[in-house]
Amino acid sequence: MYALRPTLRRSAAAALTHSKNHNYGMTPGPLALLPPIYLYRRLLRAHRKYLPREMRLLGDEYVKAEFRAHRSVDNPAHLIGFLTEWQLYAQKIEGNSWVGEKLDKGKVEKMSDEQIGQLYELMQAIQKRGTEGDLEDGDGGESGQKSQ
């Protein structure tokens, strides 16, 4: 029991430090970045655990393609930004806070034309899978007829 006291002091100090950063101890502070392979695995696990099958397949494909594309990046600033955004994404998926969330306008404005094109392609893939899912469910109603 005596050995736990320094740990409790450190925990209390950490809580005070977080509250000084204006988040009042309610939300965790910035986490250390995970190494790429651990983050990659965490993302795939989060998809498996928290997403419906269709979204999981699309998400897994996208994560794999992005990590493959960034394998040869040498710029530390790009790597840190890449890993930070994917880690925030993992936290949102695990916390289920992504549902219905809109993209941050500031982030969209900072995107390159290529990134906006990728975002558009992703949106189209999601919509396409959604309409395919409607047809497979046997709706046969108006939604199936409109997509033809």
Curated annotation (Swiss-Prot):
The gene is acu-17. Belongs to the complex I LYR family. SDHAF3 subfamily. PANTHER family: DC11 ACN9 HOMOLOG, SUCCINATE DEHYDROGENASE ASSEMBLY FACTOR 3, MITOCHONDRIAL. The keyword Transport does not apply. Residues 129-148 are annotated as: Disordered. Disulfide bonds: none annotated. Interacts with the iron-sulfur protein subunit within the SDH catalytic dimer. Plays an essential role in the assembly of succinate dehydrogenase (SDH), an enzyme complex (also referred to as respiratory complex II) that is a component of both the tricarboxylic acid (TCA) cycle and the mitochondrial electron transport chain, and which couples the oxidation of succinate to fumarate with the reduction of ubiquinone (coenzyme Q) to ubiquinol. Promotes maturation of the iron-sulfur protein subunit of the SDH catalytic dimer, protecting it from the deleterious effects of oxidants. May act together with SDHAF1. This is Succinate dehydrogenase assembly factor 3, mitochondrial. Signal peptide: none annotated. It is found in: Mitochondrion matrix. It comes from the Eukaryota. InterPro entries: SDHAF3/Sdh7. Residues 1-12 form a transit peptide. The keyword Mitochondrion applies. Its main location: mitochondrion. One of its GO terms (cellular component) is mitochondrial intermembrane space. Keywords: Chaperone, Gluconeogenesis, Mitochondrion, Transit peptide. GO terms for biological process: gluconeogenesis; mitochondrial respiratory chain complex II assembly; succinate metabolic process. It comes from Neurospora crassa (strain ATCC 24698 / 74-OR23-1A / CBS 708.71 / DSM 1257 / FGSC 987). Coiled coil: none annotated.
